[in-house]
Amino acid sequence: MSAFGNPFTSGAKPNLSNTSGINPFTNNAASTNNMGGSAFGRPSFGTANTMTGGTTTSAFGMPQFGTNTGNTGNTSISAFGNTSNAAKPSAFGAPAFGSSAPINVNPPSTTSAFGAPSFGSTGFGAMAATSNPFGKSPGSMGSAFGQPAFGANKTAIPSSSVSNSNNSAFGAASNTPLTTTSPFGSLQQNASQNASSTSSAFGKPTFGAATNTQSPFGTIQNTSTSSGTGVSPFGTFGTNSNNKSPFSNLQSGAGAGSSPFGTTTSKANNNNNVGSSAFGTTNNQSPFSGGSGGTFGSASNLNKNTNGNFQSSFGNKGFSFGITPQNDANKVSQSNPSFGQTMPNTDPNISLKSNGNATSFGFGQQQMNATNVNANTATGKIRFVQGLSSEKDGILELADLAEETLKIFRANKFELGLVPDIPPPPALVA
């Protein structure tokens, strides 16, 4: 037997069943208020606390995480806050996120971790049962913009006896009497009011109203009053010509007024027309000829014997353009022929013969050759015919003219700049 004894041999053994002994690795807290500590100064981690009203703390200063705290009146503190309905503060100073609020507490009085009610409550104002979150109720009072909401019924029961005291930005309502002023004028569907008594923003009744008031464009002429009584800036209509118009009176009525364009001369039974016109009158008097001369293109029917003593404004022989005086054949005409006309032969002592050649100027006047001239030619009673030599002209012979001049006279036509200044000899004309 060794000095230390044999542990495997019979002998004295440690009494492990002694409950009063102290085990450094275990702690049998079977008694009430067992304050026995472990080798580390605290109960071992994970020790079950089954005592009523236990105040045992863990090694970290707080009850261990997940500790069963089902005992009544548990005052233990969790590191992450209470896990019961006890009103104790958590480690972060606010109830845990997602904690259920008490049933008897009103939702608006509950505050969240951010100082406001939790999300899901009426956070933008009072509840809808009390007021509108965006202002007042449209049916009872005005909107948030100072007027009732657009399209809202401002009057519960439309009636003609109820005055609309609400001013709208677009004028008064159409279903109430027009007691308010509209910037666009009064509405015209109210039959009880006089349409012409209301005023528009433009100074006159609106379009389509009664026309018994003055118009800025003149009086309307289709009223039931006497026609043409109102003065229009454009003149009156043709129903009454007694009023003055800036464009003269219409000629459908009596021509009592003067016109700036002259009066019409188509009046019946008026042989002596003394009315003057700025453009002339139609009384067969021409301002371009004197006496009984006609106007342009008109022929004078002279049935009496005349001596041709009327004067013309364009000459002393008395003719008008395009007029052929038909005088007596017994008298010799002293007038010149008109353009394009052939004067008849009124002198029986003169025998004329046509040459058959074309005229020099193309006016249709034929060249005449005198064959039998009696003593009347000496007195100057023969008329002048273009192309024939007169008694004042000297008789030229062919020998007196140069060869170049004879070629010019024998040619069918003259060339420009090569016309002789002397008449042709009678031998070339015959």
From Swiss-Prot:
Residues 1-68, 180-294, 319-346 are annotated as: Disordered. Its main location: nucleus. Residues 365-430 are annotated as: Interaction with GLE1. SXFG repeats lie at residues 2-5, 78-81, 168-171, 182-185, 215-218, 232-235, 259-262, 277-280, 312-315. It comes from the Eukaryota. Contains FG repeats. FG repeats are interaction sites for karyopherins (importins, exportins) and form probably an affinity gradient, guiding the transport proteins unidirectionally with their cargo through the NPC. FG repeat regions are highly flexible and lack ordered secondary structure. The overall conservation of FG repeats regarding exact sequence, spacing, and repeat unit length is limited. FG repeat types and their physico-chemical environment change across the NPC from the nucleoplasmic to the cytoplasmic side: SXFG/PXFG repeats are especially abundant in NUPs on the cytoplasmic side. This is Nucleoporin NUP42. It comes from Saccharomyces cerevisiae (strain ATCC 204508 / S288c).
